Amino acid sequence: MLQLILHHPYASLAAGILLYFFCLATYRLYLSPVAGFPGPRLAALTRFYEYYYDGVKGGQFVWKVKDLHQKYGRLSCSTVVGQELKLEQGPIVRIGPCELHVNDPTFVSTLYPATGQRRNKDPFWTDQFGPKTAFGTVDHDHHRLRRGPFNRFFSKANVTRLEPMLRQQANKLCEKLEKYAGTGRVIDLSDPFGCMATDIISTYALGYSFNFLDAEDFQPNLLQGLNGFTPLAPTVKQFPWLLKLLRALPDSWALKINPKIAPFLDFQRTMKKVITDVEAEVQSEAGRPKADQATTIFHEVLRGDIPPEEKETARLWQEGEAIIGAGTFLQTPQEAV
């Protein structure tokens, strides 16, 4: 057998691959820093355990984690009730090769301390959002640099100043909804609220509104385009290089793969153009009084004292995509209105 491996390159390659996976499995099961925590062995061996429940069974991993706590959570002795010990479920289970799940709200302040601790992100979680965005930045200090220009725009005081615009958009939404009164038509409220959220955050971030509220029947809208990508999310999380491939594909090819993403592709094209327009505005405002200068998130980023590579167009349009996408797609803005 040894002679066969030494004299046949394919046999050597196969043996090397088998040895690699054997060593990897041994490390993950017995030598990893998290090897001592309870959990299914398959989850300890591969991240495809998570992918099976999220990608194949459709977003079920969060419920599987709950089951894992019930099955593998360590039991600990608590107080004596009469003659019996009260047993409590332990809060920590292993859900991946290098990942633990802690079912304890008090641990949040330890994991995300307010000050004094550096916390780098796991690329497995961030790569799916694109490495050029603040949200997708792994290094703690680099993330802080990218996040810095946005901080004041999301302070309580600055958000309070948005009230006139919020009222205007809310009145616009109500006027459109009143047109449907008595018609018997059914409106999925996620569409108008999604349109309103997109128009608000795009105006605040860019000084440009996508005017989705003006669309007939609130369609097409960005929320529909983002929903078209949702089924791909677990796969992109496992294989982040797919995100680069999807971005590189011609729009016509991408639409053949998934026609539902058409609104998102339109949004992406517009985002690139708007960022270019904002760059031109900032370059042309030299010498103008500060009171006459536009004050939006991306105008301030381009004026800010940050390295030139952080102001590149390719990075900024991805940042804009992330901010507006989050403001539209996340349930919080829609549920708030």
Swiss-Prot record:
Chain positions carrying an annotated carbohydrate: N158
Main localization, broad class: membrane
CDD domains in the record: CYP58-like
A Pfam short name: p450
Topology class, membrane: Single-pass membrane protein
GO CC terms, sorted: membrane
Practical and industrial applications: Diterpenoid pyrones display various biological activities and FDDP C shows anti-cancer and anti-HIV activities. FDDP C also shows inhibitory activity of 42-mer-amyloid beta aggregation that is involved in the pathogenesis of Alzheimer's disease.
Biological process, per Gene Ontology: terpenoid biosynthetic process
SUPFAM superfamilies: Cytochrome P450
Swiss-Prot/TrEMBL keywords: Glycoprotein, Heme, Iron, Membrane, Metal-binding, Monooxygenase, Oxidoreductase, Transmembrane, Transmembrane helix
EC number: 1.-.-.-
Stored InterPro entries: Cyt_P450 (IPR001128), Cyt_P450_sf (IPR036396), Cytochrome_P450_monoxygenase (IPR050121)
Function of the protein: Cytochrome P450 monooxygenase; part of the gene cluster that mediates the biosynthesis of diterpenoid pyrones. The first step of the pathway is the synthesis of the alpha-pyrone moiety by the polyketide synthase dpmpA via condensation of one acetyl-CoA starter unit with 3 malonyl-CoA units and 2 methylations. The alpha-pyrone is then combined with geranylgeranyl pyrophosphate (GGPP) formed by the GGPP synthase dpmpD through the action of the prenyltransferase dpmpC to yield a linear alpha-pyrone diterpenoid.
Protein's name in the database: Cytochrome P450 monooxygenase dpmpJ
